[in-house]
Amino acid sequence: MAKLRFMIKPSLREEKKLWRKGYKTVVCLDEAGRGPLAGPVTAAAVMIKISKSNLKSKILNLKSNLKGIKDSKKLSPKKRDEFYKILTKHPAIEWGIGIVSEKIIDRINIKNAAELAMEKALRNLNCKLQIANWGTEFLIIDGLNLKNNFLKKIRHRMIVKADEKVFSCAAASIIAKVTRDRIMRKLHKKYPQYRFDIHKGYCTKLHLARLQKFGSSPIHRKSFSPVLACNLNPKS
C-alpha cells in the first residue's frame, strides 16, 4: 500500500492553548539566514493582538486574509511578498525585526547570532508593546536548545519546525525571510559580481563559482568553511 503523505499546515492551535491559559501576549520567533555564506541573519517576532471580546472575529479575519500561509521556504518569492504585505499591515498583528551582521556571526557563531537576532526582534516588538517586566508573557521559538539568556528568562516553548506547525511562527518566518532577501538585493548593488540578487548568499554553484573567481567580500562570513577554503586556496 502506498504511504499517505499528509501536508502539515500551520494552525493557531498552540496560540489558542496559551490564550485559554490566560497568556494575552504570545510571541512567536523565527529566523532566516542561518545557512548562507554571506550577509546577516534576520529574525522576526510576531504577536496576534487579542481580547476576549474580539478573539473569534480576529481569528476568522486572519484565516481569511492569510489562507495558505506556511513556512517561508515553501512559498514562492511572489507569494512571500504578498503575505509580507498583509502581515505587516494587518491590524491584529504586531511584529518586530532583529538583524545581526556577518561580522558578529563570525565572532559568536551562527546559532548564538540567530538567537541574538531573535532577542533584538523581541526588543523591537516591545518598543510597540511597552512591557516593563516580562512575566505573564509566553514565547514560542522555532528550534532546539535555547542558549540566549534574555529569552531564557521568559516563559517559552521550543518547537522543532515551528514554522511548519504554528501560524504565528510561519508569519515570523515570512517577515524574517522577506526582510533578509531585501537586504541581499541591496547588497547586490554594492557587490554585483557575486549576484546576491539571485542566490541571496546561499551556497549555490553560482555563488561558489563567483566566490572562487573574486575571493570573499567584506560581507562574506569568514568563519564558514567554503569561504574559509576559498580564502586559504585562492584561484590563481
Task: Label every model-predicted segment.
Residues 1-54, 59-236:
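RNase H-like, Mg2+-dependent phosphodiesterase core
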